Amino acid sequence: MVNVLTNILKNDRLDVYPLFKKFCSLKEKGLRKESFKSLSSFIDEAKMWDDNAQQNFACWLFALFETSDDIHHVLVHPLEKELLKPLLERWMKSNPEDPRPYRWYGVFLNTENRVDYLHNALRLGGSKEQLSLLTLIDINLNALWYSFHHISEDLYLGDIKEDTALLAKSRELNNKVECQQTRKNNNEALNYYQDLLNDWVMFTKEQSKGFVEWCEHKGRNYYWVKAYYYEK
């Protein structure tokens, strides 16, 4: 995907928002202090718009975020806190059946309740909510990674029941992914963690130390086993 500033600055509709255009232009040039002054002026202006105008801006901006990389260059704290969060929260209250504000809040904004927003987007939008679906799966895969990232030191940081349930939920979500290659990649990752969990359960029934050696002797093909084994 293309850098977000490149996508925004070449967009025809940017001229509708001259102060936001100035912010992006200055940001692209690396003039952070000056860019934030323009952003502050833009936020003050946008707060005066009616809800419809604010929602139109949000639709335009988040659509660009969905097809861009490095969105942190534009989605800076003042823009999120002072404009986008309040805007989306009002939108959810005024039109609770629209999945878009839930999707954007869960995918892009800083919140402890990301999963709840994404589940709401899926509930309302169904299979059309592919970005919400993929984001949820990524969150689950990151949680599984955390559970196992010290496993070579005989340290499992997860809960067996919780991770078993997480794997099942993730497979259910992945069955709704439309892109076949993405679904295949996710399945491979989920199979990896499922095998690892199964082996850890089997290992702990036999012993408490030496999981790497146990995997080596069992012929398990985890990428970290041989590397760790040879280093020793």
Stretches with model-predicted labels:
Residues 90-91, 120-124:
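Canonical positions in the second alpha-helix
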Residues 116-121, 135:
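A short acidic, amphipathic alpha-helical/loop segment
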